[in-house]
């Protein structure tokens, strides 16, 4: 409803009542004319004419709707194809390829070299060539060159690398914007993930080294989203068996992320731990190192705590080791390189705690002796 329309209607009705005595005769004549017109409009010929007219209007509307829908569909397909191309200035560069290939003559190797200089990543190049081949106005000779070029690129590229790069591209673009990173870097990380044979701790550590510890949680979200998208793709990069193994690895990585958050947040919730070292990255590094080298716990702790330990009492040392023992015990044993390593780590920590406790008792005795 338009604001003020109610008052406008009321005002019109008031005016109508004020002038009704002047228009009585005209109203009667008009009413008779309307009755006559209605009679003519209700005749069979008029009804047929109105039906034909309404049918023509409906047909025109439907045709306009179909044309708009087809146009939007084509525009959407074009947009979607180039959205998955992560190279900057994809559309102008694609037109440049078309211009180069439209010039008659030249060897396929020359076209391939120039195309790769514009789109170094094979997934980008394949997407661009496929999109160009969808054009209906191509000369036959140009179409054949594009087909040969596409076939050559596909044959020379590892299928898993090619398909994974295509299937994760939209996720890479989305997360790249979120993380203020080049999407091509994220695409490379997904490719590495599906082909890596490294332990999950090494993969997680590599992400931290590449993106910074602040981004580690979101990077794992990207890998998970890309993997699920890849699984659902029409042309998936891996077999069902391979995807099953990757999903198990993803579960381990998510478990590692949860353990990481619990480990770091618990330790930093204690003031005496912050007194040792208040940096989240330091405790994260310690946990990842313990999963790989639990036998080095003594030296690893010394690296993290450093000279700050000299400023604290034996009681604070013992309290810290008790808390540290509990957070290490909470780490799932499956995250260690060898599951039995966790028990060996806990044994070492119990021994260190016993020593700290003995020092604490000795310190208390000395204090009592001084007071007495």
Curated annotation (Swiss-Prot):
Q: Which GO terms describe its biological process?
A: negative regulation of protein secretion; protein secretion by the type III secretion system
**GO cellular component terms, A-Z:** cell surface; outer membrane; plasma membrane
- UniProt subcellular location: Cell membrane
Q: Which UniProt keywords apply?
A: Cell membrane, Membrane, Virulence
Which spans does this entry mark as compositional bias, Polar residues?
A: 1-19
- Feature: compositional bias, Low complexity: 21-40
Q: Where is this region: Disordered?
A: 1-46
InterPro entries, sorted: HrpJ-like, Invas_InvE, T3SS_LcrE
Q: Does the keyword Transmembrane apply?
A: no
Membrane keyword on record:
yes
| Top-level taxon | Bacteria
Q: How does it sit in the membrane?
A: Peripheral membrane protein
- Annotated function: Involved in the triggering of intracellular events that lead to microbial internalization. These events include increase in calcium level, redistribution of actin microfilaments, and changes in the normal structure of the microvilli. Encoded within the type III secretion system (SPI-1 T3SS), it is essential for the translocation of protein effectors into host cells. Forms a complex with SipB and SipC in the presence of their chaperone SicA. Positively regulates the secretion of SPI-1 T3SS effector proteins SipB, SipC and SipD and negatively influences the secretion of SipA, SopA and SptP.
Q: What is this protein called?
A: Invasion protein InvE
Q: Which gene encodes it?
A: invE
